Design a protein with these regions (language model features):
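Amphipathic hydrophobic-ligand
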Residues: 20-25
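N-terminal, post-signal-peptide region of Sec/Tat-exported proteins
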Residues: 43-76
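Primarily extracytoplasmic ectodomains and periplasmic/lumenal surface modules that are beta-strand-rich
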Residues: 33-39, 44-52, 106-109
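Hydrophobic/aromatic beta-strand elements that line small-molecule binding cavities or substrate pockets
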Residues: 26-30
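Mature, soluble, non-transmembrane domains
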Residues: 73-182
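Sec-dependent N-terminal signal peptides
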Residues: 4-13
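C-terminal segment of classical bacterial N-terminal signal peptides
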Residues: 14-18
């Protein structure tokens, strides 16, 4: 089984944009098996800025992400298994909060996100990676996997940057601050 895909916390990876300079401190993933839908909400977006070039790159990447809110957006091939893909950008407490909604017709499509479905057990699972800081009230940790019942909505939150090395903490800038400087 693969690790939870970087899609969940590196915003630009949803769109096949290389150089994941924009990420989220907190990502909440909610899967609605009854509706065959997955929602991914990212909070506290930031960029690692070492130079003016990084600042410009972050702004350029954000412009690319913003363009993905249109209906004719081009999505990466890894998301081909999802029948509907929608990105919306909300503002909450002066923070930009992307919400990605994906619809699937086959649970196997979730593998692209590192979420696995066992039809015999009617359970979903994701790898337990301690540094991802996965939190949930809906699943249970069984060995190296978080396991969730496959017949009801469940969610989990990831905070993979909680233990970010100090040298990167000093370079971390909230995305709204990066964009405000334009």
């Amino acid at each position: 089984m693969e690790q939870i895909i970087i899609f969940f916390f590196a915003l630009t990876s949803f769109f096949g944009i290389e150089n994941n300079i924009i990420a989220a401190d907190k990502t909440t993933v909610t899967i609605h098996p009854q509706n065959q839908q997955i929602e991914i909400v990212q909070e506290e977006l930031f960029a690692i800025i070492r130079s003016e070039a990084d600042l410009n790159l972050a702004r350029e990447k954000w412009a690319g992400v913003s363009a993905m809110t249109t209906s004719d957006a081009t999505w990466p091939q890894a998301l081909d298994g999802f029948t509907t893909k929608t990105l919306s950008l909300a503002s909450l407490d002066s923070q930009i909060q992307p919400q990605l909604t994906l619809t699937y017709s086959d649970e196997q499509a979730l593998r692209a996100m590192g979420v696995w479905y066992d039809a015999k057990k009617k359970q979903f699972s994701v790898n337990h990676v301690p540094h991802d800081n996965l939190q949930t009230e809906d699943g249970k940790l069984v060995g190296n996997y978080w396991v969730f019942y496959g017949d009801k909505t469940f969610s989990f939150t990831l905070e993979p940057f909680k233990q970010m090395p100090e040298k990167y903490q000093q370079l971390k800038q909230p995305l709204n601050q990066v964009l405000a400087e334009i």
